Each structure stands twice: as C-alpha cells, then as structure tokens.
C-alpha cells in the first residue's frame, strides 16, 4: 500500500504539503509483477480520471488455446479499449482530469468533483514491455483522500508482453 503522505510530498514538495492536505485528492500507484516475479513500476504513464466506465471484456481471449491467436485477441482488446476511450473522451463531462505517473508509478488528482469516477490507464501504456490497462472505480468524498492501487489483480484486460 502506498503512503498517501509520500505521494503528496512527491507532487507538491514540503512547502506545499499544508495547502495540499486542505484540498480533496485522489492518489494512487501503478505496478505489476514481471515474468521473473519482480515488481515493475508504471513510470511516466498517462492516467485519466473519467466519469463513466467503458464496456470491455477479454473473456473470449482467455478461452483461446492457441498461443498466437490468444496474443492477437488480447492485442485487439487493448486496441478496442483505446478506440472506445478516444470516442468517449469527446463527450462533454467524460474526461475529468489527466495526469502522468512519477518514476515510482505514483500519481495524484487534485480537487476532483465528489462522486464515483474511474481511474483509467490504456494503450499505449507499457510497463516493462507489457501492455497494461486499468479501469478502477474510486469514490471522492469531501474532506477525504481517495486511494487507488493499480496492480496485476485488477487489470481490466490481461497484460500482454510486447515482442
């Protein structure tokens, strides 16, 4: 679990921590385990805060037994997720905020509106050569810091190694 204080400190610095704590925040971190089992951080990835969930499923890919067809299917799911995001972001009110992760995979959104939103990461995001995608709900309540951890277990699509 990430330290909320350390994430805020990395974004606003020691002088701005008092002011930062006065606002509403969503803070989070991104990491996966690579094939060797080592933690790899989502460095310099675009992260989006959006108002609505994009329908997506890779179930058909997981049932595929032929390796190359499975890889192709997962790649197509990542591309479809990207295209759906591109279409939805044109809708008024869909894209709430955008940020970029730090070198250690941390990110923050300052003063998001109250309510339930989704933290979204999509193609062309890569971590350690893996395509990754997330769409995780987060609820913003006034005076509370929302925390989101994006990792292997809550990927919206299977990670796929880029070859």
Residue spans for each PLM region:
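Long luminal/extracellular ectodomains of secretory-pathway precursor proteins
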Residues: 16-163
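Bacterial N-terminal signal peptides
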Residues: 2-15
């Amino acid at each position: 679990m990430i330290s909320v204080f350390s994430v805020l400190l990395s974004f606003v610095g020691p002088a701005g921590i008092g002011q930062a704590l006065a606002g509403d925040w969503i803070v989070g971190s991104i990491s996966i385990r690579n094939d060797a089992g080592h933690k790899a951080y989502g460095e310099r990835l675009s992260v989006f805060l959006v108002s609505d969930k994009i329908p997506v499923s890779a179930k058909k890919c997981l049932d595929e037994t032929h390796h190359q067809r499975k890889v192709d299917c997962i790649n197509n799911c990542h591309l479809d997720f990207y295209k759906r995001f591109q279409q939805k972001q044109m809708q008024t009110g869909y894209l709430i905020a955008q940020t970029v992760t730090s070198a250690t995979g941390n990110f923050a959104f300052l003063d998001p509106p109250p309510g339930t939103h989704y933290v979204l990461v999509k193609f062309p995001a890569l971590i350690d050569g893996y395509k990754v995608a997330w769409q995780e709900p987060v609820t913003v309540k006034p005076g509370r810091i929302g925390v989101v951890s994006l990792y292997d277990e809550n990927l919206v699509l299977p990670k796929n190694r880029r070859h």
